[in-house]
Amino acid sequence: MSTTYLLGLAVALAMDAFAVAIAVGIGLKRIRFRQAFRLSYHFGLFQALMPIIGWALGTGIRQFTQSYAHWIAFTLLALVGANMIREALSDDEEEPGEKDPTRGLRLIILSLATSIDALAVGLSLSMLEVSIWYPALIIGLVAGAFTLFGMLLGQRIAKLQRFSSYAEVLGGIILWAIGLNILYDNGVFSPFL
């Protein structure tokens, strides 16, 4: 596998992580180093591990992955996005960091949602009979870098907004849009168009 092809693949896989990181950056009032590190690290780690898992599983779940992966990714993103919107519109006062998507279950869900495509790539690479270790490393590093850049870009976008109180709502809407785009890319809406 050529380095150019591998970098192109890594960038393509990092796009979901990048878009979700923008949404997270918009939703956070202020990005701390720990938050940026946690999100970048976890997105990169999951992006690196999923191709390895897919490669190890080989063809055993190939049909499932191709048929249902887009629904799983959409559901995870829609749940987190809906929760972000609900919390932004609620009047409940919460402790700082309680809504932090770079912690706990939210972090795991977002990491899974942005890396499901990498599982399918791992399955594909197993059929090409190539070593998975170098591609997984590159995919993880690129995803981590794009995540960091996306968070910083999202923070800049949030600062430009006139009504920053709606930043988290915008972040939730972006997650929904990403999820719907995943369904669109997989032809779910084609019978209706």
UniProtKB/Swiss-Prot annotation:
The gene is mntP. It is a multi-pass membrane protein. It comes from Desulfotalea psychrophila (strain LSv54 / DSM 12343). PANTHER family: MANGANESE EFFLUX PUMP MNTP-RELATED (PTHR35529:SF1). It comes from the Bacteria. One of its GO terms (molecular function) is manganese ion transmembrane transporter activity. This is Putative manganese efflux pump MntP. The keyword Membrane applies. Keywords: Cell inner membrane, Cell membrane, Ion transport, Manganese, Membrane, Transmembrane, Transmembrane helix, Transport. Belongs to the MntP (TC 9.B.29) family. Its main location: membrane. The chain crosses the membrane at residues 6-26, 41-61, 65-85, 107-127, 132-152, 169-189. The keyword Protease does not apply. Probably functions as a manganese efflux pump. GO terms for cellular component: plasma membrane. It is found in: Cell inner membrane.
